[in-house]
Structure formats: structure tokens, C-alpha cells
């Protein structure tokens, strides 16, 4: 299973990109907004899931773990394939999907091209109670200083990859951001080091 890619963007347009990883170009299906955010020649990191069918292999890429998790839940709903799942995420954020399901409101899904009334209702019913883990961690108080979202997001992904629960990692990142000077939290390496120091071996052992 290809769970993520990090490499150089060779092309990006519409809802797709090609990312060069070690000399191999991977074609990845993305939301249009995600594809537009990529720049040819820049390094990109995407979370991925591979959809295997009898006649094709398709790699879908996502900017965050929450988006990937929602995609996989949507793709598991009867009548919703990967194309419709990525269409939903092209219109709605993971939080908006969770809010609509929590409110038993199928209107946002009916507004997505390719999703009919019956499928929209089925999405709401099928995903009820399954989306709590797909929400992003609460942001720090507005009175607290913040790190650039790309920096804090990258650190959060790294910590989750190291085995910390996303909630624990998110809280630790927020605490470090709130308690350090801007110059000490303006890079992924520095913020990650400070957050790991705060979590400490005792915290890791307690997980």
C-alpha cells in the first residue's frame, strides 16, 4: 500500500498531479484546490490511498489525514465510488462533511455533482457516528501566537507518524507554539524538536 508520497511536482492541473519520487513519476488524483496549490518544481508531500480495480490502479492524494479518512469513509458508502468521494471533498471540507452528517442534513451532498438525493441520504445514514476522529484538532485561542499552518501541520503529521495520538500531538504543538518566541517556532525542525522535548519519553511510554 502506498500511504504517502514526497517528491518533486512534475505537473499539476485540473484534479491531478504527477510527483517524481526517486525517478518514478506517480500520477495522483487530487481535489482541484489541492492541485492548484502545487507548483511545478517544488517538493510536495501528500497522503495517499490506492484504489485497486480489475482493470485499473488509481492513486488518490490528500493534503491532510482528515481528508484521507473522510475519503475512505465516503468510498465505503454503497453507491459512492472514489470519483464521487473526491468530488465531495472538492466541495466540502472534512469538518463540513462532519457537520452535515451530525445535523442529518443531506443538502450539502445533494449539491455535489454526481450525488443524487438517495445517495446523499445514504451518506448521512452511513457516516453517522464515524466522523469524530476526522475533525482537525481545535485551534489555539485567538489570543495565543500561532505558527504558520504549513509548519504546524507538518509537525503534527510527523508526530502522528511517530506513533503519538493526533489529539495528544495537536495539544502539545499548540502548547509549544503558545509558550515560545516566534523565531523559535518558524521551522518544522525547530518546532518538532521543541514538541518532542515537551512530550518526552515519559509521555511516550504512557501512551
Swiss-Prot record:
GO terms for molecular function: ATP binding; four-way junction DNA binding; four-way junction helicase activity. CDD domains: UBA_RuvA_C. It holds the Pfam family RuvA_C. Residues 147-207 are annotated as: Domain III. It comes from the Bacteria. InterPro entries: DNA_helicase_Holl-junc_RuvA_I (IPR013849), Hlx-hairpin-Hlx_DNA-bd_motif (IPR003583), NA-bd_OB-fold (IPR012340), RuvA (IPR000085), RuvA_2-like (IPR010994), RuvA_C (IPR011114), RuvA_C_sf (IPR036267). Residues 142-146 are annotated as: Flexible linker. GO terms for cellular component: cytoplasm; Holliday junction helicase complex; Holliday junction resolvase complex. Keywords: Cytoplasm, DNA damage, DNA recombination, DNA repair, DNA-binding. Residues 64-142 are annotated as: Domain II. It is found in: Cytoplasm. GO terms for biological process: DNA recombination; DNA repair. Residues 1-63 are annotated as: Domain I. NCBIfam families: ruvA. Homotetramer. Forms an RuvA(8)-RuvB(12)-Holliday junction (HJ) complex. HJ DNA is sandwiched between 2 RuvA tetramers; dsDNA enters through RuvA and exits via RuvB. An RuvB hexamer assembles on each DNA strand where it exits the tetramer. Each RuvB hexamer is contacted by two RuvA subunits (via domain III) on 2 adjacent RuvB subunits; this complex drives branch migration. In the full resolvosome a probable DNA-RuvA(4)-RuvB(12)-RuvC(2) complex forms which resolves the HJ. Belongs to the RuvA family. Has three domains with a flexible linker between the domains II and III and assumes an 'L' shape. Domain III is highly mobile and contacts RuvB. The RuvA-RuvB-RuvC complex processes Holliday junction (HJ) DNA during genetic recombination and DNA repair, while the RuvA-RuvB complex plays an important role in the rescue of blocked DNA replication forks via replication fork reversal (RFR). RuvA specifically binds to HJ cruciform DNA, conferring on it an open structure. The RuvB hexamer acts as an ATP-dependent pump, pulling dsDNA into and through the RuvAB complex. HJ branch migration allows RuvC to scan DNA until it finds its consensus sequence, where it cleaves and resolves the cruciform DNA. This is Holliday junction branch migration complex subunit RuvA. It comes from Leifsonia xyli subsp. xyli (strain CTCB07). The gene is ruvA.
Amino acid at each position: 500500500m502506498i500511504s504517502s508520497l514526497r517528491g518533486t511536482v512534475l505537473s499539476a492541473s485540473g484534479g491531478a498531479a504527477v510527483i517524481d519520487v526517486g525517478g518514478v513519476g506517480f500520477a495522483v488524483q487530487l481535489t482541484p484546490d489541492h492541485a492548484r496549490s502545487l507548483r511545478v518544481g517544488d517538493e510536495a508531500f501528500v497522503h495517499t490511498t490506492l484504489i485497486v480495480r480489475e482493470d485499473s490502479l488509481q492513486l488518490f492524494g490528500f493534503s491532510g489525514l482528515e481528508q484521507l479518512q473522510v475519503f475512505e469513509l465516503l468510498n465505503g458508502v454503497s453507491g459512492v465510488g472514489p470519483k464521487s468521494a473526491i468530488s465531495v471533498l472538492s466541495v466540502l471540507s472534512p469538518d463540513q462533511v462532519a457537520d452535515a452528517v451530525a445535523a442529518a442534513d443531506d443538502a450539502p451532498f445533494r449539491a455535489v455533482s454526481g450525488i443524487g438525493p438517495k445517495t446523499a441520504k445514504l451518506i448521512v445514514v452511513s457516516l453517522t457516528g464515524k466522523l469524530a476522529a476526522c475533525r482537525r484538532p481545535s485551534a489555539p485561542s485567538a489570543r495565543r501566537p500561532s505558527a504558520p499552518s504549513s509548519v504546524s501541520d507538518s509537525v503534527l503529521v510527523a508526530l502522528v507518524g511517530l506513533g503519538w495520538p493526533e489529539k495528544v500531538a495537536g495539544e502539545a504543538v499548540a502548547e509549544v507554539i503558545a509558550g515560545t518566541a516566534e523565531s523559535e517556532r518558524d521551522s518544522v525542525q525547530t518546532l518538532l524538536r521543541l514538541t518532542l522535548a515537551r512530550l518526552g519519553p515519559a509521555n511516550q511510554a504512557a501512551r
